[in-house]
From Swiss-Prot:
GO BP terms in the entry: L-histidine catabolic process to glutamate and formamide; L-histidine catabolic process to glutamate and formate
Name used for this protein in its record: Urocanate hydratase
A molecular function (GO) term: urocanate hydratase activity
The keyword Ribonucleoprotein belongs to this UniProt entry's keyword annotation: no
Pathway(s) annotated for this protein in UniProt: Amino-acid degradation; L-histidine degradation into L-glutamate; N-formimidoyl-L-glutamate from L-histidine: step 2/3
Length: 554
């Protein structure tokens, strides 16, 4: 099993010419390749897209077999992918998904990192994260708006809606955490982001997600102070260990205005540098002593969470940004680790109740103009959504495309299918140079069960009920999504989440119209259904307004 091959450079084809038999197979082929584009993936030579060890394919042989299968797949065939390996091609029908993916799923009793790593070493499994193994990662842009919405709501709740002159302390500049500095400045706040890898900081500087790197903590704090006094947002990256830097900031009596963290704490072996360790020592011992690495990392996480708790007790808005760091600290004896909330119950759940979540699309042409034309179409179809218009304007101005040009914007039930149909009409008319794919993060209102993140503190106590993402995947399959994925462990690690994804192609056909109308209505509707079933009044009202048939509501 060959995983590391830094000589392999993968980039998706561009333009209107097909390399597969149809756009319904060309699309997953290009998006798989795009996940491993050097401008997109964190460690493309190792097939790692983001999130610690979130991979696009199990190994390079599996990648090559998937590519070959997609190029030869007929319009009535479906490819099955098991944890990054193609395992079967079956006759289905043209409206069925062309690819069905299951990644990292384990029977609950065995759903631990230890058992996963054992299978991973044997070549029997891979970690798909959320959008890595489901082939719809679009770089850090994919989480920028969700992070922006979180920071805006944080400012609204705690600072009268104005983050000017405020600053956010955080850590982690990987594929997900790398969105934080840009999201902060877009929301009007400055940001100090601690990152242990120089390469990650360099990547965020190069792609415009962070403004400047400080030489040391003194300079970092001086830059933050200067920007706050001027009320001009600035993002500052600092190389260092999160536990050490957070503790030193607290020791100095410096008070941030908001505190969070987005290191890859969900994976204590591969995702978090233990305090006092060098990168070289960490990388070597991950192979020779993974249990020792995990133990040291969790001790350091506990130290960092204790500092976050101290800020929380001092009245600083402090939030877990979905990496399960509180759980790791709890397991290390920090009894009150969950005293500060996760970002979903604190700031995002009202959006989920209306089926609003991370709608994203990507231009298979490779031409940025196709994205700009779709941006304009979104504004035209949603003329009264000033907040969304402002987001789209900022995104065009501040977000650099990584790989195939793409866009993210949070829209909900009743709007997603309208946008999908409009994009398909633009492909049909030739206004767009090639088809568009529409997908989303697995972090959405109806597609995930994650008691320490998306479904934390549900109104009815149903945090751990994972029937909902399974139903979401089944419904998207029945509705005709182009590819559907069902994963375990994304975001928060083994044993803590199950989640589903879907992607659908706008190829300009009338058949695509029918599929788009079904999928892009049903997918967000499952989120409204899930939250209505849990008793949220906003979701119940939305379900009734939209005419959803939910028998248990009466």
């Amino acid at each position: 099993m060959t995983r590391l091959d830094n000589a392999r450079i993968v980039r998706a084809p561009r333009g209107p010419a097909l390399t597969a038999k149809s756009w319904l197979t060309e699309a997953p082929l290009r998006m798989l390749m795009n996940n491993l584009d050097p401008d997109v993936a964190e460690r493309p030579g190792d097939l790692v897209v983001y999130g610690g060890i979130g991979r696009a394919a199990r190994d390079w042989a599996s990648f090559d077999r998937i590519v070959a299968a997609l190029k030869d797949l007929d319009e009535d065939q479906t490819l099955l992918v098991q944890s990054g390996k193609p395992v079967g091609i079956f006759r289905t029908h043209p409206d069925a998904p062309r690819v069905l993916i299951a990644n990292s799923n384990l029977v609950p009793h065995w759903a631990t990192w230890a058992h996963f790593h054992e299978l991973d070493r044997k070549g029997l499994m891979m970690y798909g994260q959320m959008t890595a193994g489901s082939w719809i990662y679009i770089g850090s842009q994919g989480i920028v708006q969700g992070t922006y919405e979180t920071f805006v709501e944080m400012g609204r709740q705690h600072y009268g809606g104005d983050l000017a002159g405020r600053w956010i302390l955080t850590a982690g500049l990987g594929g997900m955490g790398g969105a934080q500095p840009l999201a902060a400045t877009m929301a009007g706040a400055s940001c100090l982001a601690v990152e242990c890898r120089a390469s990650s900081i360099e990547f965020r500087l190069r792609t415009g997600y962070v403004d400047v790197q400080a030489r040391d903590l003194d300079e970092a704090l001086a830059l933050i102070d200067e920007s706050c006094r001027a009320r001009v947002p600035r993002s500052v990256a600092l190389i260092g260990n999160a536990a050490e830097v957070f503790a030193e900031i607290q020791r100095r009596g410096v008070r941030p205005d908001c505190v969070t963290d987005q290191t890859s704490a969900h994976d204590p072996v591969n995702g978090y540098l233990p305090r006092g360790w060098s990168i070289a020592e960490w990388e070597a011992r991950r192979e020779s002593d993974p249990d020792g690495v995990a133990a040291a990392a969790k001790r350091s996480m506990a130290e960092q969470v204790r500092v976050m708790l101290a800020f929380h007790r001092a009245g600083v808005p402090t939030v877990d940004y979905g990496n399960n760091i509180r759980q790791m600290a709890l397991e290390e004896g920090v009894a009150d680790a969950f005293a500060f909330p996760g970002f979903v119950p604190a700031y995002i759940r009202p959006l989920f109740c209306r089926g609003v979540g991370p709608f994203r699309w990507c231009a298979l042409s490779g031409d940025p103009e196709d994205i700009y034309r779709t941006d304009a179409k979104v504004k035209q179809l949603l003329p009264d959504n000033a907040h969304l218009h402002r987001w789209l304007d900022m995104a065009r101005d501040k977000i650099r495309f990584q790989g195939l040009p793409a866009r993210i914007c949070w829209v909900g039930l009743g709007d997603r299918h309208r946008l999908g149909l409009a994009f398909n009409a633009m492909v049909r008319s030739g206004e767009l140079k090639a088809p568009i794919v529409i997908g989303r993060d697995h972090l959405d209102s109806g597609s995930v069960a994650s008691p320490n993140r998306e479904t934390e503190a549900m109104r009815d106590g149903s945090d751990a009920v994972s029937d909902w993402p399974l139903l979401n995947a089944l419904l998207n399959t029945a509705s005709g999504a182009t590819w559907v994925s069902l994963h375990h462990g994304g975001g928060v690690g083994m044993g803590f989440s199950q989640h589903a994804g879907m992607v659908i192609v706008c190829d300009g056909s009338e058949a695509a119209d029918r599929r788009l109308e079904r999928v892009l209505w049903n997918d967000p509707a499952t989120g409204v259904m899930r939250h209505a079933d849990a008793g949220y009044p906003e979701a119940i009202a939305c379900a009734r307004e939209q005419g959803l048939v939910l028998p248990s509501l009466g």
